[in-house]
Amino acid sequence: MAQDLIKEQLQGVNLFLIGMMGSGKSTVGPLLAEQLGYRFFDADVLIERVAGKAIADIFAEDGEDTFRDLETEVLGHLAAQTRSVIATGGGVVLRRQNWSYLHHGLVIWLDGSLELLLARLQGDEARPLLQVENLEERLGNLLAQRQPLYAQADLRFPLQADQDPLAIAGELLATIPGLLKPQCSAEQN
């Protein structure tokens, strides 16, 4: 019942999940979408489909700029959708053009601490930006660079190490109506 009310208040607006790699966007996103009766899209999966290769291969063969171009292209298509929860890549916030697409929906920042991200990403060989000798230093630098950009989100959701993804989705659902009320009031004035 509460989900029906939230769906009505959202009026089909997309939810964009942003945050560092390892913050759980691709895990929480489908749960949130299911509870809302929305579709779920993982931008990284779509980028791989468009490119016809894995993200690691895009970085290795074509470079980060090509990956970011594909990311912007895919995000533009996703922003045109409605009733969707979209898990974005961690660096989506780096390009100003991407923000014009993100602002077509509600932007939710899943904010994980450096310690939490380190624990989740240790030994992950699929992420090209993390193939370095000092993972903690690399993650810390990326986090410092991106935090001010993530802070532009409509909602910051601080993550705890022991949180269940389903509980996170539930807490987000409970928070969303409070974000929408001011938007509705502003439109009526």
From Swiss-Prot:
Mg(2+) binds at S26. Pathway: Metabolic intermediate biosynthesis; chorismate biosynthesis; chorismate from D-erythrose 4-phosphate and phosphoenolpyruvate: step 5/7. Its main location: cytoplasm. GO terms for biological process: amino acid biosynthetic process; aromatic amino acid family biosynthetic process; chorismate biosynthetic process. Substrate binds at D44, R68, G90, R146. It catalyses: shikimate + ATP = 3-phosphoshikimate + ADP + H(+). GO terms for molecular function: ATP binding; magnesium ion binding; shikimate kinase activity. Pfam families: SKI. Its cofactor is Mg(2+). One of its GO terms (cellular component) is cytoplasm. Its EC number is 2.7.1.71. Keywords: Amino-acid biosynthesis, Aromatic amino acid biosynthesis, ATP-binding, Cytoplasm, Kinase, Magnesium, Metal-binding, Nucleotide-binding, Transferase. It is found in: Cytoplasm. SUPFAM superfamilies: P-loop containing nucleoside triphosphate hydrolases (SSF52540). It comes from the Bacteria. Catalyzes the specific phosphorylation of the 3-hydroxyl group of shikimic acid using ATP as a cosubstrate. PANTHER family: SHIKIMATE KINASE (PTHR21087), SHIKIMATE KINASE 1, CHLOROPLASTIC (PTHR21087:SF16). Monomer. Belongs to the shikimate kinase family. This is Shikimate kinase. The gene is aroK.
